């Protein structure tokens, strides 16, 4: 039977041999990871079940053969097994931390029990002056020495643990360029390799815990997550003091509903991920001003999206959106809306309620028309519709009194409404590449006196309207692959101002009842333009 001193010595040795104890933040992070892994596993299994039900319904009409049926059953089980294995892998590191902390708590209890035993033995020895019934030495100094020895060793262990934690905390994740420095015994050694510089799920959760306790206001994880992280931990909602959050350039597929707790968030960057949808709680981010969701896989927006009433800048480009929700009209403070490279077939009529819009980019979609309500966007300055299927513009486009740039190139536009000439602030107008459809410009195009750039390339326009002469500010004019006959191609090649001067001179000539300009008079005009007119006979030109 070991003596009390030997028992204390053995207990102390065992305690010293334990691995480093995880910090509180690490334990909380591990618990958050386990909760997230459970939620992700359940969601993925539900998705597999829905896919199976859909496939079963579609194949019910044509019953598969026995071999095919067995293969499908094997495939379904393989999918479910893959989901469970993925969840197991995600839980592995977190489960170790949680179990490690549980074992440390057991040791804490054992240490306390040992301390109580020694203390009670010491008290009994002092009172009785002899040997206790438990066999411990009862007289005087021996039991006191044992208690002092135990306490001394406990203090030594605690000091060693504190030093270890300080050493770990001094390194943290600073080498990764992150603002917060959580104490983490699970930190990977940062090497020159790109993969080794990224964070595992539990490291992300630990960083969130530490950042939340420090009350940080800005956090960037741009490109910092390992590729295996597709779901963020539910503890993300603890970052309640954060105003700017950058999660871009990762492989995130889903956000936890707890993101709605980030009530002070004003800027959120999620571009270049794999987001399929947004949680309903997303609409609770009522202070959000800047939101970047471009380059994801979004197919729809939640109905709560209209609650983001502070939103000023929204980038939804390069997704898979086929429609925008009607609630978009509630975003009265929205100034910049980018929805390029989606699958939009129409805009909601409520777009007209976004009266603060200054910039609207809809390039590379499947739009066939614009709603008349577009004319209510009185502050709109930029409207781009490049590469859609639009056949005509609404007459209300003339109400866009502040419009400076309009691009309807690569469409199927047949007629440009005369009303567009009331948009007298236009500086840049691109009507190119409507190919066989567009045959004429508005007769009143000369009203656009601020126009500096005009592109009518690859259309079927043959004649410019007389009012073209009023475009005195025009400095760029493109008409490539457009069969212009009037003015002649030679004039167009000389540039925008040459065309304007030609139209002016022609109008003046008509005003003095001169005959219609023919080929000979064109050459006379051309040489007068350069101040080098000579007699036709001297240069051999036709008369």
Curated annotation (Swiss-Prot):
Induction: By light. Belongs to the SHOC2 family. It comes from the Eukaryota. GO terms for biological process: intracellular signal transduction; response to light stimulus. Leucine-rich repeat protein that likely mediates protein interactions, possibly in the context of signal transduction. Gene3D superfamilies: Ribonuclease Inhibitor. Pfam families: LRR_8. LRR repeats lie at residues 239-262, 264-284, 285-307, 309-331, 332-354, 356-377, 378-400, 402-424, 426-448, 449-470, 472-494. SMART domains: LRR_BAC, LRR_TYP. InterPro entries: Leu-rich_rpt (IPR001611), Leu-rich_rpt_typical-subtyp (IPR003591), LRR_dom_sf (IPR032675), LRR_domain-containing (IPR050216). A motif (GVYW) lies at residues 495-502. Keywords: Leucine-rich repeat, Repeat. This is Plant intracellular Ras-group-related LRR protein 5. Widely expressed.
């Amino acid at each position: 039977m070991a003596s009390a001193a030997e028992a204390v010595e053995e207990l102390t040795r065992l305690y010293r041999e334990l691995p480093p104890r995880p910090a509180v933040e690490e334990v909380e992070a591990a618990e958050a990871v386990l909760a997230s892994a459970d939620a992700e596993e359940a969601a993925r299994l539900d998705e597999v079940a829905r896919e199976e039900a859909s496939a079963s319904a579609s194949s019910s009409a044509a019953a598969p053969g026995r071999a095919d049926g067995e293969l499908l059953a094997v495939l379904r089980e393989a999918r479910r097994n893959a989901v469970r294995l993925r969840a197991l892998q995600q839980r592995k590191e977190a489960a170790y931390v949680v179990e490690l902390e549980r074992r440390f708590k057991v040791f804490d209890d054992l240490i306390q029990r040992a301390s109580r035993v020694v203390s009670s033995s010491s008290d009994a020895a002092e009172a009785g002056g002899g040997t206790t019934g438990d066999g411990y030495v009862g007289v005087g100094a021996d039991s006191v020495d044992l208690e002092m020895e135990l306490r001394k060793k406990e203090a030594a262990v605690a000091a060693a643990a504190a030093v270890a934690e300080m050493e770990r905390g001094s390194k943290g994740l600073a080498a990764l360029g992150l603002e917060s420095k959580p104490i983490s015994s699970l930190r990977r050694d940062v090497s020159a390799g790109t993969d080794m510089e990224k964070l595992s799920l539990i490291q992300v959760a630990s960083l969130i815990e530490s950042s939340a306790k420090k009350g940080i206001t800005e956090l960037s994880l741009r490109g910092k997550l390992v590729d295996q992280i597709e779901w963020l931990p539910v503890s993300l909602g603890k970052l309640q003091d954060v105003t700017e959050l950058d999660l871009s350039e990762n492989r995130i597929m889903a956000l936890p509903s707890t993101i709605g707790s980030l009530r002070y968030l004003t800027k959120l960057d999620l571009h270049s991920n794999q987001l399929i949808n947004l949680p309903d709680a997303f609409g609770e981010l009522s202070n959000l001003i800047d939101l970047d969701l471009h380059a994801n896989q979004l197919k729809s927006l939640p109905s709560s999206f209209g609650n983001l009433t502070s939103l000023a800048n929204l980038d939804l480009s390069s997704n898979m959106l086929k429609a925008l929700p009607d609630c978009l009209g509630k975003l009265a403070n929205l100034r910049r809306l980018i929805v390029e490279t989606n699958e939009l077939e129409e805009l909601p009529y409520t777009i007209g309620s976004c009266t603060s819009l200054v910039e609207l980019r809809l390039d590379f979609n499947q739009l066939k028309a614009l709603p008349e309500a577009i004319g209510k966007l009185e502050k709109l300055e930029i409207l781009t519709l490049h590469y859609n299927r639009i056949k005509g513009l609404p007459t209300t486009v003339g109400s866009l009194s502040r419009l400076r740039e309009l691009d309807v190139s690569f469409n199927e536009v047949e007629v440009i409404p005369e009303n567009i000439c009331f948009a007298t602030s236009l500086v840049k107008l691109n009507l190119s590449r409507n190919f066989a459809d567009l045959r004429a410009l508005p007769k009143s195009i000369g009203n656009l006196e601020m126009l500096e750039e005009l592109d009518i390339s690859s259309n079927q326009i043959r004649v410019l309207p007389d009012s073209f002469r009023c475009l005195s500010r025009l400095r760029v004019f493109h008409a490539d692959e457009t069969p212009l006959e009037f003015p002649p191609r030679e004039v167009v090649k000389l540039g925008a101002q040459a065309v304007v001067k030609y139209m002016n001179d022609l109008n003046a000539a008509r005003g003095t009842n001169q005959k219609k300009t023919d080929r000979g008079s064109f050459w006379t005009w051309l040489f007068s333009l350069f101040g080098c007119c000579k007699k036709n006979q001297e240069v051999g030109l036709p008369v």
